[in-house]
Amino acid sequence: MRLSDVSHPNQLHGLTTAQLEDVACQIRERHLQVVSTSGGHLGPGLGVVELTLALYQTLDLDHDKVVWDVGHQAYPHKLLTGRYGDFDSLRQQNGVAGYLKRSESSFDHFGAGHASTSISAALGMALARDRQGKDYKCVAVIGDGALTGGMALEAINHAGHLPSTPFLVVLNDNDMSISPPVGALSTHLNRMRHSAPIQFISDSVQEGVRNIPFIGKEIPQEIKSLTGSVKRLAVPKVGAVFEELGFTYMGPVDGHDIAQMTRTFQAAHRIGGPVLVHVATTKGKGYPYAEADQVGYHAQSAFDLTTGKSIPSKTPKPPSYSKVFGQTLVKICEQNSKVVGITAAMATGTGLDLLQKAIPDQYIDVGIAEQHAVTLAAGMACDGLRPVCAIYSTFLQRAFDQLIHDVGIQNLPVTFVMDRAGIVGADGPTHQGQYDISYLRSIPNFTVMAPKDEAELQRMLVTCLSHDGPTALRIPRGPGEGVTLMEEGWDPLKIGRGEILSEGSDLLIIAYGSMVAPAQKTALCLKESGISATVINARFLRPLDQGLIHPLARRIGKVVTMEEGTLLGGFGSAIVESFADQDIAVSTYRIGIPDKLVHHASPQQSKEELGLTPTAMADNIKKRFGWDNSDSLFVKNSNTSTI
């Protein structure tokens, strides 16, 4: 069968193992061809090709439900569900999404992008099925890295107490998340990977009893209990965690043996109640470079298939904000043993891999457990350490209660560095860092800031660690501005103080963080039209530099705020609120991300669509204030506030 002819996964039914293995080769070929050309997640999907084929052999996806955790391993699923022809548009504007989206396909039963949600969602579907008297299978596919998340364990705890609810969890154990997984559960799973399949030991005992003349067909409960004891004795501790939580444990099964997995899934579907099938896979299977470097090939930009090397950018770029942060933190840790870096399974992405390599004793990876990371840091701060939590903006929102309850209320000196703040591009709405400004500015005792460039990032990190209270620092994805960096000796900033970058009399532009450089370019565009603007680098969201901003606003009378975050409750809202509190009557135009989802596209494409490029912002400012040669003196905009 040609993969290009598959539009429905039920077309796999009836194929021989050899035919399915041929389809597996075609999936890997298409997967590699597209990702090597346009970039995307590589290792996760390559590791679950056979798993996907075997599972879909045993399901009727016109009715049955499959929830893929996170979604970055679901490229084979997409190729089997009618998206082969469009797969070249993967993660591109208006193309196939990199994660699952209910709006994209009827086979995407639950959208995702963050880890550890699949078991809860699939269990919810199973309960809805039973309450409505329907009959279909519900399956969650979750990786061993995502299983470290508290939400996944909460769902397992719940499902295990529902013995009459048929429900299947497939544990895709590749011994990796993005970085190698950590913790006792991961260690336990690693031991299990190398153990004999446990359910088949139980099955063998029961089959032997069934063959006993006269009594075999009537297996008493005592014999069933005995088989459970044999399982525990034969393979000590293997699967015991899940068995004790109420699941029937099956495995570990070779995740690249289609026939064995098909038999296992068929057997699992016949068991009533919750079942966990443990499948051992290799991340990056079938592509030697991805198998050898499973962290580096988790996700890739465009690369050469023959050499495995990334295709270099045509123009050299400055170091990324993440790298500058990591390098600076290493320098600080070398001088202060009380500073500790904490990550939630994102060491490489946040730059903390540099600290891990340089000073491992001052580095902690808690796994995919953002809530735990925040409260762990709070506990460390209670006893004299200076923890620095480096977490993506989109993932930190998972620990909102801990930010308030465990850090903010207790006024503890924990520093949060929010990487990927703002528009991140091809990963789409689940990964945009557009909400941290709004949710952090509401938390008491927090000092919140964002740098205009990588040199200011260095000073802000020192500022955070010099402050006796909770601090948050947002940095964007991608390269810095290319400014000169100091190796050491960074002076802390005065908290709550911004700076004037240029002066003009017609307009006051107040920009925050990554929007400062675009604000300066916007001012130059306006200057070409004879409009002079004062540009302020706000530096701080909380507290605002009202002593700088308010007198200028009163004098100039026209104010524009710029932020790379949602306008609802954002930086612009903070400015407008401060004007209202002081009865400052000015006309204010807020520029940022409107009340909408930002879908997958390149960051530049998203900014163009949102009107966040310097040219677009200059044009909109001229329209807003009647400087566009129109007859109207005043063009209203939905983002405008007049105080």
UniProtKB/Swiss-Prot annotation:
The keyword rRNA processing does not apply. Binds 1 Mg(2+) ion per subunit. Binds 1 thiamine pyrophosphate per subunit. Pathway: Metabolic intermediate biosynthesis; 1-deoxy-D-xylulose 5-phosphate biosynthesis; 1-deoxy-D-xylulose 5-phosphate from D-glyceraldehyde 3-phosphate and pyruvate: step 1/1. PROSITE patterns: TRANSKETOLASE_1 (PS00801), TRANSKETOLASE_2 (PS00802). Keywords: Isoprene biosynthesis, Magnesium, Metal-binding, Thiamine biosynthesis, Thiamine pyrophosphate, Transferase. Thiamine diphosphate binds at H72, G113, H114, A115, G145, A146, N174, Y287, E370. GO terms for molecular function: 1-deoxy-D-xylulose-5-phosphate synthase activity; magnesium ion binding; thiamine pyrophosphate binding. Its cofactor is Mg(2+); thiamine diphosphate. InterPro entries: Dxylulose-5-P_synthase, THDP-binding, Transketo_C/PFOR_II, Transketolase-like_Pyr-bd, Transketolase_BS, Transketolase_C, Transketolase_CS. GO terms for biological process: 1-deoxy-D-xylulose 5-phosphate biosynthetic process; isopentenyl diphosphate biosynthetic process, methylerythritol 4-phosphate pathway; terpenoid biosynthetic process; thiamine biosynthetic process. GO terms for cellular component: cytosol. The keyword Transferase applies. It comes from the Bacteria. It catalyses: D-glyceraldehyde 3-phosphate + pyruvate + H(+) = 1-deoxy-D-xylulose 5-phosphate + CO2. Mg(2+) binds at D144, N174. Its EC number is 2.2.1.7. SUPFAM superfamilies: Thiamin diphosphate-binding fold (THDP-binding) (SSF52518), TK C-terminal domain-like (SSF52922). Homodimer. Catalyzes the acyloin condensation reaction between C atoms 2 and 3 of pyruvate and glyceraldehyde 3-phosphate to yield 1-deoxy-D-xylulose-5-phosphate (DXP). Belongs to the transketolase family. DXPS subfamily. This is 1-deoxy-D-xylulose-5-phosphate synthase. The gene is dxs.
